[in-house]
Structure formats: C-alpha cells, structure tokens
Amino acid sequence: MSIIEAIIIGIVQGITEFLPISSTAHIVITQFLFDYTFPGFGFEIFLHIASILAVILYFRKDLLQVIVGFFSYFKDKSEENRIQFMFAIYIIVATGITGVLGLLLEDLVGAQMKTPPFIAGALIITGTFLIIIERFFVYKDRTVKDMTLKDSIIVGLGQTLAVFPGISRSGATLITALFSGLNKETAVRYSFLLSIPVILGTSVLAIGDLLDGTLVEQVGGLPLIISFIVTFFFSWLGIIWLIDFLKRSKLIYFAFYCFALAIFVFFYFDHNMTIDLE
C-alpha cells in the first residue's frame, strides 16, 4: 500500500465510521473507484480500532462514570449508581444480541453482498429509515434513567443489521434508539458507547494478523502506522462534528446523502463487480 492510499483509506474510514452512512460501504466504494485491492478483513478491523480509540478518549468521562457506577452499585445502592449499573447492563445486552446474531448471520454475508446493487439497496434502506424517524415519528424525551431492557433489545437487533454492507451501524443504533423513545442526546451517547465493545470484540480477529506480521507484510509498516493515525484523527473530528450537527440539525440530511450515493453506486459501477474484505 502506498502512503497516498493509506491516507485516503484513513480519511474515508475516519470520517464515515460514526456517521449514519456506512463506513464499510464507503471503504468498498473507495476500492471500486481506485481499483485497489483491500489488504483483508484484519486491516479493516485494525482501522476500526483506531476509530474506537477516538471514541474511548472522547467519551472517557462517560465511560469511567459507567464503569465506576457499575462496580460501585454492588456496595452502594444509590440512585446514581443504579442508573449507571443498568446502563452498563443495557450496553452488555445489546452487545450480546449483536454478537450472537452476527455469528449466526456470518455465513450469509458473502462476496455477493459486496456488489454495487446490494450496497445501493442497503443505502436506500438506511436513507428511508432516516426519513421515517425524522418525518413520521414524534421525538420523545426519555433519558438514560428511563431506559428499559426492551430498549437495549431493540437497539441490539438494529445494530445486528450492520453486518450487511451499506447498513450503517451508527445509523441503525441511532434510528432504533430514537424509535424506542430515547432523546437525541441519550441515543447518540448510547450509540457511541455501544460501538466500543462491539468493535473491540471483533478486533481479536486482527490481533493474530498483527502479531504474526501478516498485516505489516500486506500493508507495509509505514502505511499501516499512517492509516491508523489518519483514521484516529478523522474519527475524532467526525465525533465532534456529528454531535454538534445533531444539536443543530436533523438526520434527514444524511438520508439525502444516502440516496444520492446509492444512485451513483448503482449507475456508475459494473453490477458484476465484487470486493471481498475477508
């Protein structure tokens, strides 16, 4: 991998990771555009780790609050500790549902789903649900203290859909969290914190390739480092921008983007093209 390719991939991954527009779809589209062969699934997960590092650092206070509250609840049954304890449980439940269903659906998601028509269709589905949640759904004002087990199950099921290329993980979790009645601030926080165990869980698949030198051999030491740093930097910017954007604007603008990108993907690329990230 060249330095330029490492920078481009890092920028695309970082910017799109947490926006409701599917980072995997954009990585695949980038490969279509530049006729570039992706190093493998291990490299994709390696970049996800950079994105998650940005989340951990940005939400470090929230994360610490949840962890401390979770363990403190065993000794101190205060209301604040109870809220944080239950929030941790809701993260665990949603993650568990996603993990189990993700494994069951693993064999279903093959190279045939990494084609322009499938990705375009998935982007249209994402855009459609973004419009539905904005135009036909009345926002409620439930916060973390109002969450229930039902909310975590709904969001966990929604997050599972992200195994399909073109379905955004952040989009799926935001939509289902809002649908369950959580306010925007709580939905965004829940979505970001949920990404940590999900992506760290899949990152074990890349550790072997990294330790035995496979990733370094496939990508190159310097491009690997550069892609990681660039991904981290643009993920950090993406987090800041998305949180600020959602305070001022609506998810429907992402829907318009998904529709435009779907049209471009469907009509610009050969429908027989496939890219397997495995």
From Swiss-Prot:
EC number per UniProt: 3.6.1.27
Compartments it resides in: Cell membrane
Catalyzed reactions: di-trans,octa-cis-undecaprenyl diphosphate + H2O = di-trans,octa-cis-undecaprenyl phosphate + phosphate + H(+)
Keywords: Antibiotic resistance, Cell membrane, Cell shape, Cell wall biogenesis/degradation, Hydrolase, Membrane, Peptidoglycan synthesis, Transmembrane, Transmembrane helix
Record has DNA repair as a keyword: no
Bilayer topology: Multi-pass membrane protein
Main location: membrane
Pfam families named in the record: BacA (PF02673)
GO cellular component: plasma membrane
EC class: hydrolase
GO molecular function, one term: undecaprenyl-diphosphatase activity
Lineage top rank: taxon: Bacteria
Transmembrane segment boundaries: 1-21, 38-58, 85-105, 118-138, 191-211, 223-243, 251-271
GO biological process terms on file: cell wall organization; peptidoglycan biosynthetic process; regulation of cell shape; response to antibiotic
UniProt keyword annotation of Cell membrane present: yes
InterPro entries in the record: UppP (IPR003824)
PANTHER family documented for this protein: UNDECAPRENYL-DIPHOSPHATASE
Additional free-text comment from the UniProt record: Bacitracin is thought to be involved in the inhibition of peptidoglycan synthesis by sequestering undecaprenyl diphosphate, thereby reducing the pool of lipid carrier available.
Listed HAMAP family: Undec_diphosphatase (MF_01006)
Family: Belongs to the UppP family.
Annotated function: Catalyzes the dephosphorylation of undecaprenyl diphosphate (UPP). Confers resistance to bacitracin.
Protein name: Undecaprenyl-diphosphatase 2
Organism: Halalkalibacterium halodurans (strain ATCC BAA-125 / DSM 18197 / FERM 7344 / JCM 9153 / C-125)
